Amino acid sequence: VLRSNFRRISDDIAKGNAVGDPIRPLQPGEVAPEFALPAVNLEGAVSLAGLRGRPFLIGLFRGLHCPFCRRQVMQLGHVQPALQSAGVETLAVINTPLERARLYFRYRPTPIMLLSDPDCRTHQAFGVPHIEFLPEGSSERPEWPARASMADFEAARVNPTRELPEPLQPMASNGVLNAMDGFELDETDQAIFAQHGTQLVGHFLVDAAGIVAWAQ
């Protein structure tokens, strides 16, 4: 089931219209792409044009269905005061529709500026890849994690927050952590997962002139 589900997700994403290079994240020295997204914890929209003149760190995450991304957003909130004191704005783009995101963060507020991008267009514009699964028997060289065989993905084991009793396969770890958090995916979360389940994450520091200064 896992094999067929992820091949379907990967095929669906591959048919979409990507903005920018979907497998090569922007690098230092390159111009940050234009974006304008609705704010989750503010009124109105936030855009690159509106941020010009101020350096900012932007994190591009999966949706709320991903327990690892929920934790990374919290961690980003912990470093926000230090970044703010250095004159750097902190933004997090989450792959969840606006109203669903607002409901969640109403009860779990964060000091960082949250933006909603259910279509992952900003992720694509910054070149943040999704996992592309190689056909079975392919001679292409895997480039983990952006390009992998299904066998490699199924064999992977993760426990980055050390909350699990032992490292688990990525999708299995999602289920365990969501259960630990008491987080139940609703229809909106399920739809986002079905469309963007293989999306990866990225962080970019953009200077006051709109140029990428650091990327991870």
Feature locations, PLM:
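N-terminal targeting signals for export/organelle localization
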Residues: 1-38
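Residue-level signal for well-ordered, solvent-exposed loop/turn and beta-edge residues enriched
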Residues: 30, 43-44, 211
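Short loop/turn microsegments at loop-to-beta-strand junctions
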Residues: 33, 55, 200-202
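Hydrophobic alpha-helical segments, especially N-terminal targeting/anchoring helices
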Residues: 38-40, 206
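Short active-site neighborhood of thiol/selenol oxidoreductases, capturing the structured segment around
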Residues: 46-77, 89-90
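Catalytic metal- and UDP-sugar-binding loop of GT-A-like glycosyltransferases, i.e.
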Residues: 60, 93, 206
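Structural microenvironment flanking redox-active thiols in thiol-disulfide oxidoreductases
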Residues: 72-125, 162-163
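Thiol/selenol-based redox catalytic cores and closely related redox-interacting motifs
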Residues: 117-216
